[in-house]
Amino acid sequence: MGCIKSKENKSPAIKYTPENLTEPVSPSASHYGVEHATVAPTSSTKGASVNFNSLSMTPFGGSSGVTPFGGASSSFSVVSSSYPTGLTGGVTIFVALYDYEARTTEDLSFKKGERFQIINNTEGDWWEARSIATGKSGYIPSNYVVPADSIQAEEWYFGKMGRKDAERLLLNPGNQRGIFLVRESETTKGAYSLSIRDWDEVRGDNVKHYKIRKLDNGGYYITTRAQFDTLQKLVKHYTEHADGLCHKLTTVCPTVKPQTQGLAKDAWEIPRESLRLEVKLGQGCFGEVWMGTWNGTTKVAIKTLKPGTMMPEAFLQEAQIMKKLRHDKLVPLYAVVSEEPIYIVTEFMSKGSLLDFLKEGDGKYLKLPQLVDMAAQIADGMAYIERMNYIHRDLRAANILVGENLICKIADFGLARLIEDNEYTARQGAKFPIKWTAPEAALYGRFTIKSDVWSFGILQTELVTKGRVPYPGMVNREVLEQVERGYRMPCPQGCPESLHELMNLCWKKDPDERPTFEYIQSFLEDYFTATEPQYQPGENL
């Protein structure tokens, strides 16, 4: 969400295959200090989707009822704890997966491996717990602990993680051949997948996936000739012998401490005085973005909005919805200052906006595989927004944030419809992002998930051109007129034709003919691996 100033019919063909696909390029040191991105295991939300737009009085509908393309859905993170609520008497013992430093006087500091009795877990993301080691009680983030006697407590178990996210994690710089993790199978209920980092002369660093199947009697196997009573015994066996796998299991893949769900218990509408603005990161037509600290303890990003940008009551209503949208490719909304000037407090992402990263940061040096992977991450987040019947309305590189190891997260989802500035609400004013907006949205205000798909096609051109302004040499009015007449941007230099064909699908005149984000995600995630089997049979298996 920010100021825009103008400067200047086929299905996808066979996908581009590079001669050598190497591991992702590692970004250099943080621009604003070391910070991590959330790539820890997440759990699936159960139950039917909620139409968030109907709750927030959006004048136009959410996702289109027509889904012209298929594609595999991906995992997404919990909206609330997946554990049973109402535990009494501390019967279930939980163990910490990560260290945690208390942020308030009501919080409980703890170390990885510390055990707890849960006193009260009925209040969502923050549980009241008692440390068995110290006897102290306080609130702990519920996504930092798991039942002590469960498979989730194993360091190598990463839960509901998609194949692509497993590959991103295992291929992080510094990881060696044989590093591994176990996750839930995406394709077979009750089964698991073993993902291992490998190397060969043809592909270089790569990841192999093996399906772990479950026997009727409860045992587990990759090959029927080697069966085990428990997953733990299976993992132990393959750490001692490769036994047909591409490599013996060496060390567990390092995980990254996840973001907590919110800053602390009951820290939603917070006092302005609890925030310290420290480093100005950017400025737009509607406000500024700062790196700062909450409560003297927690690094955050703070978006400050100019008075009059939006009605505080409408913002607070929308923010209540936005904070329920949780996915590891969406920037989490932590807290708000709801009186003008409005402050929006979110996770701090160390590399800043994707636009700045491509134009001025290490993104200038990225090659096509890394750029396609970033597009796939954005499509992953948008596919979640699609499933939740929500709309972004302002999808472009300036509203994507980048963290360590090229992790991308979508920011500012849903805020655009609240802006009250006349130069924006006119839809053709100087501040409106015409070049990213679908014609039916720019001309008639028909914003849907399909207009977001159009914007994603424009965002793809930003990626492959390293941040070039779309429609170079054309002003806003000219763009609107030409697009209405059927003009579409030509294939950017160095962009494979199959990627340009995907862009053209996103730019179909009829919104219902545009692909779903689910399809786009599937297309991009498999862009370089479409000819390979998803699971390896292994040698002599």
From Swiss-Prot:
Manganese among keywords: no
Gene disruption phenotype: Knouckout mice show reduced OCT2 tyrosine phosphorylation and reduced OCT2-mediated TEA renal secretion. Knouckout mice are protected from oxaliplatin-induced acute sensory neuropathy. Mice are viable, fertile, and display no apparent phenotypes. This lack of phenotype may be attributable to compensatory roles of the other SRC-family members.
Gene3D superfamilies membership: Phosphorylase Kinase, domain 1, SH2 domain, SH3 Domains, Transferase(Phosphotransferase) domain 1
Catalyzed reactions per annotation: L-tyrosyl-[protein] + ATP = O-phospho-L-tyrosyl-[protein] + ADP + H(+)
One annotated GO biological process: cellular response to transforming growth factor beta stimulus
Domain SH3: 89-150
Main location: membrane
GO CC terms: actin filament; anchoring junction; centrosome; cytosol; Golgi apparatus; plasma membrane
GO molecular function: ATP binding; enzyme binding; non-membrane spanning protein tyrosine kinase activity; phosphotyrosine residue binding; protein tyrosine kinase activity; transmembrane transporter binding
PROSITE patterns: PROTEIN_KINASE_ATP, PROTEIN_KINASE_DOM, PROTEIN_KINASE_TYR, SH2, SH3
Highest taxon of the lineage: Eukaryota
CDD domains linked to this entry: PTKc_Yes (cd05069), SH2_Src_family (cd09933), SH3_Yes (cd12007)
Record-annotated SH2 domain positions: 156-253
Keyword match Electron transport: no
Function: Non-receptor protein tyrosine kinase that is involved in the regulation of cell growth and survival, apoptosis, cell-cell adhesion, cytoskeleton remodeling, and differentiation. Stimulation by receptor tyrosine kinases (RTKs) including EGFR, PDGFR, CSF1R and FGFR leads to recruitment of YES1 to the phosphorylated receptor, and activation and phosphorylation of downstream substrates. Upon EGFR activation, promotes the phosphorylation of PARD3 to favor epithelial tight junction assembly.
Name of the featured protein: Tyrosine-protein kinase Yes
The species this protein was found in: Mus musculus
